[in-house]
UniProtKB/Swiss-Prot annotation:
Pfam families attached to this UniProt entry: PSI_8
Disulphide bridges, residue numbers: none
Single GO biological process annotation from the record: photosynthesis
Classification via InterPro entries: PSI_PsaI, PSI_PsaI_sf
GO cellular component, one term: chloroplast thylakoid membrane
Membrane topology note: Single-pass membrane protein
Species this chain originates from: Marchantia polymorpha
Similarity section: Belongs to the PsaI family.
Function per UniProt: May help in the organization of the PsaL subunit.
Localization (cell): Plastid, Chloroplast thylakoid membrane
This protein's name: Photosystem I reaction center subunit VIII
Highest taxon of the lineage: Eukaryota
Record key words, sorted: Chloroplast, Membrane, Photosynthesis, Photosystem I, Plastid, Thylakoid, Transmembrane, Transmembrane helix
Transmembrane segments: 10-30
Length: 36
């Protein structure tokens, strides 16, 4: 029964967190590049 509603939670979670981590790491990389 767990597998029936697990993708409906897991997919939006990855869809929101993964781009957020990507944008955050890119922002930190740009900021460090400007400082150096």
């Amino acid at each position: 029964m767990t597998a029936s509603y697990l993708p409906s939670i897991f997919v939006p979670l990855v869809g929101l967190i993964f781009p957020a981590i990507t944008m955050a790491s890119l922002f930190i990389y740009i900021e460090q590049d400007e400082i150096l």
